[in-house]
Amino acid sequence: MSNYSKYIPEDLAKELLEFWMPMHRYDLGSYDGKPYFDTEDKESPDWESCDRYRIPTYGDVIDWFSSKGIHITFDVFFTFALADNVAYLWKVSYIDESNDDIKLVTISEEDALDGKEGCGGSFELDAQSAIRYAMKLKNLI
């Protein structure tokens, strides 16, 4: 399974829905067995009538940001500090083509090596950090 075909965590999916990322909403009886989240907790009296959304994959989210001019990329590198595993360096870039100038804003961040944040080599944790940064960047533009 590719890293890009893995599903993002439910809390990040809810943040992206609030951020206006379009997501597949299930109609009554249309559930297809893929990971989902409800807009209400099961304990809520409105749970039975709430909306249910399919949780997107990392690839879905990265493609959506790309369609908005925000590009998320990952570079893989090998490091002995991570017990001979690979680690990831992520970059988020914005290209504004609304006028003749192309503007590029980039941040790069190396995966944490100390085990507290990401334990190194974690595509999921790096991708979540990159997506959250892209959300902040989109709010600024």
Predicted regions and their residues:
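Short amphipathic alpha-helical segments that mediate assembly, nucleic-acid/protein binding
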Residues: 9-13, 58, 102, 106, ...
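Ampiphathic alpha-helical segments that act as solvent-exposed interaction surfaces
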Residues: 108-141
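N-terminal segment of the canonical double-stranded RNA-binding domain
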Residues: 22, 34-117
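Charge-rich, low-complexity N-terminal segments
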Residues: 1-48
